[in-house]
Amino acid sequence: MKKIIALILSALLVCSAASCSGGNSSSKAESKTEAATEQKTEAPTNDPEIQAALDKMAEDYEFEGVVYAVKDGTQVASYAKGKLENGDEITLESPMPVGSVSKQFCAAAVLLLQEQGKLSVDDTLDKYFSEYKNGKKITIKNLLSMRSGIPEMTEEGNENLVSNDKTEKENVDAIKKWVFSQELDHDPDTIFAYANVNYFLLSNIVEQVSGEKYVDFLRKSFFTPLNMNHTGTIGELPSNPDWAKGLDYKKVDTQPGLTNGCGDIISNTHDMTVWINALSSGKAISKDSYKAMTTDYSPETHYGYGMFLDISGGVGHYGSIGIYSAFDYINEEKKFTLFVDSNTLEQPTEINSVVDELLKALMK
């Protein structure tokens, strides 16, 4: 899906530079993404040139899902096509899983706790996992930047590590037991190695430090204050499916607890646009914390804390889980944000293509 996302981004950025500097008075009125913004049911008028570029890209790639682009606080392009698992039409308000885009929320939660003086990214893991033999070697910062050396928990051979027949706690305990028994793949802070296990452990640290369930801390700290009323976690679907009507829990293809911190968020275009603006503007976390998120700790791959940093002049993250693929993007220089989600692009390479092309068009 990366290729598709690239197409979307290139299309939008090219057109925005060419046609949006003066703006469109009819499209400016209703698309500010302040923290107190309420869910809108009527979409503002899109910029004709940018919308045309997006529509062409979507047609060429037979893209199904949602795209939402905002420049200078104004919606400039939107797209919604396809069906949810229950047959309902996909709309801009349809919540869908965002996969690894979830890592931004986990990184922000850790940094917020640091702002509150409750932890430090320089803490070593033995402070939180006394049973971990390598705990003294690895810091929270190593987890955030994917430089811990901890082997991936979902590697081949671990298919029976977790199960839908087990509770979330049982699965979490099983994963931790396995992780803490393994040797490191490499010394900490020597190599970037993308692994979900890093953010899985971070979510557990958030729970320990806050004294709350991870999702409860996210809701209290981010979702509720930012009026992200269509955002929650995969684990909430079986007991509270109404807020994400149309989603099939089985299509997410995960077991309770497995995605904690690393791929557990479900959201929609409005909430994700609010989120990425709040994240970069100092509303969700401090400016200093956001700077830490977007600092390059791995020049070979350009990764910060839950953010890839070298995407057409901006930052963002790709996500893929089950049948869903997503992408969010922030370009502070051009004051442009983008969110893409699909329930038909099962391979990450597909959404990458969409984003690459859309960004090219927007950047012209």
What annotation goes with each model-predicted range?
Residues M1-I4, I8:
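Positively charged n-region of N-terminal signal peptides that target proteins for export
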